Design a protein with these regions (language model features):
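Sequence-structural signature of mature extracellular/luminal beta-sheet repeat domains
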Residues: 1-348
Length: 348
């Protein structure tokens, strides 16, 4: 009987303490649109099951991928390394940032530009020497980038409040802490182009570089920011109500954008968004008790008008899931991820 009393006492003391203890977030209400059905262009298929898993078991969380002129594959991993996969499959360390490298892209001089969530915007030369380009604009979560023909780097800061390990808190708080910025290597100046984005993520320039796309992961949408023409300096909705959380996006500079969706929409999360009090309570729980993403592999091909021209799936997520980035190179798609131990390669 004493154990029953002890349990009741624990409940009497513990529950009010949990309820009234300060929450790590101050969440806002948000009523998401109903998730689209997976029909038409979104119809599931098994295309991603043909993906070859490179360096399986030898890398962890290579979030973004790029390939150099010699066909060597680069990715930034959870332990702060930029790994390089040689043609024979050998994995070596190209550089160590000491942070969490996320988006990366080669410039025209062969330098690897890296968005490091902790260190800012970095440049790494062919010898692996690291130079910090920008830590300005009070960013704490540098995320993804693309580079135009003049060398200007367009990049995102996902959140100016939450660091990379706290991305689920940013999701639940549902407030616009993200920014979209540019860095000019000639003047070494950083400019904030857009504020008030809901987890600013993937960045991709159009074929003619007249506009750039920016993913808002936690609003299931893509924003178009105009760089040239009458609309230069303005932005508009490019695509809305996606079937999952948009992460990385890239352009093949031939009119096609490749969009990575690491997780499908989650009805529990969508329903919680209308109940800020419950979100604040959940945010007090350990990370392993928070809602989990359903394993699913999904990559979308988009044209420059925002139409889905192709979708690639692994519907049961057994072979490949959690795709965070996708890059087209020499007839293949290369795919990265946040928490898996491979680099994906799929022949087009």
């Amino acid at each position: 009987m004493k154990y029953v009393y002890g349990f009741l006492l624990l409940l009497i003391i513990g529950v009010p303490t949990f309820v009234f203890m300060p929450a790590p977030i101050d969440s806002a209400a948000y009523d998401p649109p109903s998730a689209p059905r997976l029909t038409g262009a979104f119809t599931p298929n098994d295309a991603l099951k043909e993906t070859e898993l490179l360096a399986a078991g030898l890398v962890y969380g290579p979030e973004d991928i790029d390939v150099d002129d010699e066909g060597r594959i680069y990715g930034g991993t959870q332990d702060g390394k930029i790994i390089r996969i040689l043609k024979d499959g050998t994995v070596e360390t190209f550089a160590e940032t000491g942070g969490r490298p996320l988006g990366l892209h080669f410039d025209s001089q062969g330098n690897l530009m890296v968005c490091d969530a902790w260190k800012g915007l970095l440049s790494i030369d062919a010898q692996g020497v690291i130079e910090t380009l920008s830590t300005e604009a009070d960013g704490v979560f540098t995320n993804d980038l693309d580079i135009d023909a003049e060398g200007i780097i367009y990049f995102t800061d996902a959140s100016h409040k939450f660091h990379q390990p706290e991305y689920k808190l940013d999701l639940m708080e549902a407030k616009p802490y993200g920014r979209f910025m540019s860095y000019d290597p000639r003047t070494k100046e950083t400019h904030v182009l857009l504020k008030g984005l809901y987890f600013a993520n993937g960045v991709a320039l159009s074929e003619n570089e007249d506009f750039v796309l920016v993913n808002e992961t936690y609003r299931y949408r893509i924003i178009r920011y105009w760089l040239k023409g009458e609309k230069a300096g303005t932005h508009e909705l490019f695509m809305d109500n996606l079937p999952g959380f948009p992460d990385g996006i890239s352009s093949n500079r031939k009119g096609t954008f490749w969009l990575a969706i690491p997780a499908p929409r989650n009805a529990t999360i969508d329903n919680l968004h209308t109940r800020p009090f419950l979100k604040d309570l959940l945010a007090k729980l350990p990370n392993f008790l928070l809602p989990k993403a359903k394993p699913y592999g999904l990559v979308l091909a988009l044209d420059e008008e925002g139409n889905v021209t192709e979708s690639l799936h692994d519907a049961d997520g057994v072979h490949i899931n959690g795709v965070a980035s996708v890059q087209e190179h020499a007839g293949y798609l290369y795919m990265g991820n946040l928490h898996r131990d491979w680099v994906g390669r799929l022949k087009l």
